[in-house]
Amino acid sequence: MDSEEFRRLGHQVIDWVADYRERVARGEFPVMSRVAPGEVRAALPAAPPVERQPLDGILDDLANIIVPGCTHWQDPRFFAYFPSNSSLAAVLGDFLSTGLAQLGLNWQASPALTELEELAADWLRQMLGLSEAWSGVIQDTASTATLVALICARERTTDYGAARGGLQASERPLIVYASSQSHSSVEKAALLAGFGRANVRVVPVDDRYAMRAEALQKAIAADEAQGNAPCAVVATVGSTATTAIDPLEQIAGVTRAHRLWLHVDAAMAGSAMILPECRSLWSGIEQADSLVLNPHKWLGACFDCSTYFVRDPQHLVRVMSTNPSYLRTAADTRVRNLRDWGIPLGRRFRALKLWLLIREQGIQALQQRLRRDLEHARWLAAEVDAAAGWRRLAPVPLQTVCVRHVPAGLSGEALDAHTLGWVRRINQSGRAFLTPAMLGDRWMVRVSFGVEATEHQHVVALWRQMREEAERGS
């Protein structure tokens, strides 16, 4: 393919994507894919082609085979999981990143990649109202950032002994603390960082599903009495199930008293802190050691773009640094080598999409959109509160509303069957997509707002469909 053919085919692909996005915004596809397991693969040739194939035929396969196998995360009727916005400016940034084909092994390998990532992370820091004490880097996902945080915590607790001698260097079991509402990535990070699942303590939550600081204090004291080594606390700002917010100020008081690392997982909810009126939700954040939030979720920077902030970058670099001779340069003492800020040696030019998003939309437009999403959640919460037979199961600090329809006389497994039944009918209709989740030992339904194209009319239509399906025959 020469540059002229690339130009011609590139226009064709951009047109295809633009048409697809317009069709998604109009609701022309079922929101959740209806394909059966294995259906997409079975529709495609099992062996690779020997000769080149024309793009027209490839785009036909894309439209007829691939798209039906896609769940449409940018559909305005998508209320499942969490928002994972892909703003068009960020899409172009991703395209430019791939076209520039930069590989960030060190500063010299791509000075622009390194310095734009520093800048984009610092822009976001300013937008969030964080102090200059924080330094940021872009990781792929919050799972990776949490793993890096726990490795840093491990090395601080062992005075870098684990890095030198492995897990055998610690004479006492190292303990990690997180609430029952924390993300599953915390357990995986503890496993991969060598703590082991048995050394993750699940701290009880209060009636708002937030970690109880006094319970954390008791758990730490119990471990110390047993001769264990408390190491790190992972607090959550915006839990996956209910967007519960752990009390960072109180938790930080406990971690300071015991010299524990405090990592804050604000993967989805952190974007809300570009709104000054939301920042009280993470009061105490300046006392944390590390923080992760994902601009590829609510903000719109396209997956994957997860920002990891630390207060002690020198410690991070010491923990993560490798310095083979073939990567050393004369500039090393004057620049940031991002290979030492995380796990991978190389990195994509992820900063381009975040930089383009912020420049093309501006802070004001981003704030406006997030405020609209918060209003959608407040509207639905009020409707649920006023409707007979409906229960709102958790506070609504941000954009997720947790609900259950409870017909008279229905409880236990019968109520679970009812809940799963009406949400399944909504999802199968193709007119909306919701995800159920367990709260305690019973099923409920999460309504998560945040898709860029969602307007009030879509929220009204969803509530109407929820009532139709749940109240049918009750």
Positions of PLM-derived features:
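N-terminal entrance/gating region of PLP-dependent enzymes' catalytic architecture
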Residues: 1-133, 424, 428, 432, ...
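Conserved PLP cofactor-binding pocket of PLP-dependent enzymes
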Residues: 395, 400, 428-446
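Conserved PLP-binding catalytic core of the aspartate aminotransferase-like
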Residues: 392-426
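Conserved PLP-enzyme active-site core in the AAT-like
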Residues: 141, 145-317
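PLP-dependent enzyme catalytic core of the Aspartate aminotransferase-like
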Residues: 436-474
